Amino acid sequence: MYTLEEIKNQLGLKSEKKSIVFPEAESEIIQSVAKTLVDEKLGLPILLFKSSKEVPSEIKNNSSIKTICLDEFDTKEFEEEFVKLRKGKATIEVAHQVMQLPNYIGAMLVKLNQADCMLSGLNNTTADTIRPALQIIGTKPGYNIASSIFVMSKGNENYIFTDCALNIKPTSEQLVEITQMAVDFAKALNVKNVEAALLSYSTNGSGKGEDVDRVHQAVEILKSKEKDYVCEGEIQFDAAFDKKTRDKKFKNCSLLKQTPDIFVFPDINAGNIGYKIAQRMGGFEAIGPFVLGLNQPVNDLSRGATFVDVLNTAIMTLYLSY
C-alpha cells in the first residue's frame, strides 16, 4: 500500500494539477493547508468565503489560490442546475436557499467541473457535507450508496476499516457495495492480491442470528461474482486478524495472508467503536474518513481535525481525483 509520503511525491510530479475546493475558507487551518498545497505544488486550492471582508491579505495576494466570495457570487446558473438535478424534488426557491450554503456551492463547482474535488467538515456535520454531495454529484454507476473508510496505519502495518461513518445498519446488498468500494480503494493505493474479511460475532456459522445471516448472505453474493480479490466471512475479528487463530476456527478459509487488507464491519456501531479502539488502545493512526462511491471525490473532516489531519486528507482527496 502506498504511504502518504509516496502519494504526496506522486502529486508533486504530476504535470497537470487538480483543484480542490474548501467551503470553510474562514478557518485558519484551511488557509494554512491551501498555502501548503501551493508551496509544495500538490494542488490548486479554491477557497469559498461567505464575505469578501473575510479574505485575508496573504490569501488575496496569492495568485495561486482562487477565492470565491458568496456575497459577490451569482448563483443563478447553480440554482437552475440544482433544480434540473433534483428532478422535481426542489423548486427554484429551494435552490436559491441552498445555494447560499458553501457546501452546496462547493459540490456544484465539482459537478460542473469547475473544481476536481471537495473537502469540508471542519465546522460542519458529516450530514451537512455529504448531503450536498449525494444530491448534486451522486453515486457512481452500479452503486446505490456512498460508503466510508479509514486507513489505519502504524509503522509498516496498514489496514482499511469500513464502513465506520455513513451506513448505520447496512443490508447484505449494501455490505456487498461497501466491500467492493473498499477493494477499489485498496487497488488505487497499489495493494496487491486484495483480501477482505467481513466481520461478525460468528465465525463460519459458529453463532446464529439475523445479524450473522446478513453478513453471511453478503459473502455469498460476493463469492458468486466474478472478481479479482478474495473475500471471506462471516468471521470474528481475532480469526480474521491472525492466521493461526483462523486456521483453528475456520477450516478451508479462503483468506491466505497473515492479516487481510480490509476489515468490513457489520454496522456503524462496530465500525466506529473498532477504529477508535485501534486508534486509542492500539496506537494506530486513523487517516480519514474517506468517502467512497461518489462520481467525484468529496471528503468529510472531523470537527476536531488538526492542520496535519486536514493536509493529509486533502492530499488523499486530490490523489483520488486523478
From Swiss-Prot:
E.C. number? 2.3.1.8
- GO MF assignments: phosphate acetyltransferase activity
Q: Does the keyword Cytoplasm apply?
A: yes
* One example of a Gene Ontology biological process annotation: acetyl-CoA biosynthetic process
Q: Where in the cell is it found?
A: Cytoplasm
Please state the protein's primary subcellular location: cytoplasm
Q: Check the record and name the InterPro entries matching this protein.
A: P_Ac_Bu_trans (IPR012147), P_AcTrfase (IPR004614), P_AcTrfase_dom1 (IPR042113), P_AcTrfase_dom2 (IPR042112), Phos_Acetyltrans/Butyryltrans (IPR050500), PTA_PTB (IPR002505)
Q: What class of enzyme is it?
A: transferase
Pathway(s) of this molecule: Metabolic intermediate biosynthesis; acetyl-CoA biosynthesis; acetyl-CoA from acetate: step 2/2
* Single GO cellular component term: cytoplasm
The reaction(s) catalysed by this protein are: acetyl-CoA + phosphate = acetyl phosphate + CoA
Q: Which Pfam families match?
A: PTA_PTB
Keywords, A to Z, come to: Acyltransferase, Cytoplasm, Transferase
Q: Which family does it belong to?
A: Belongs to the phosphate acetyltransferase and butyryltransferase family.
> Entry's PANTHER family?
PHOSPHATE ACETYLTRANSFERASE
Name of the protein: Phosphate acetyltransferase
Annotated source species? Mycoplasma capricolum subsp. capricolum (strain California kid / ATCC 27343 / NCTC 10154)
What gene is this protein translated from?
pta
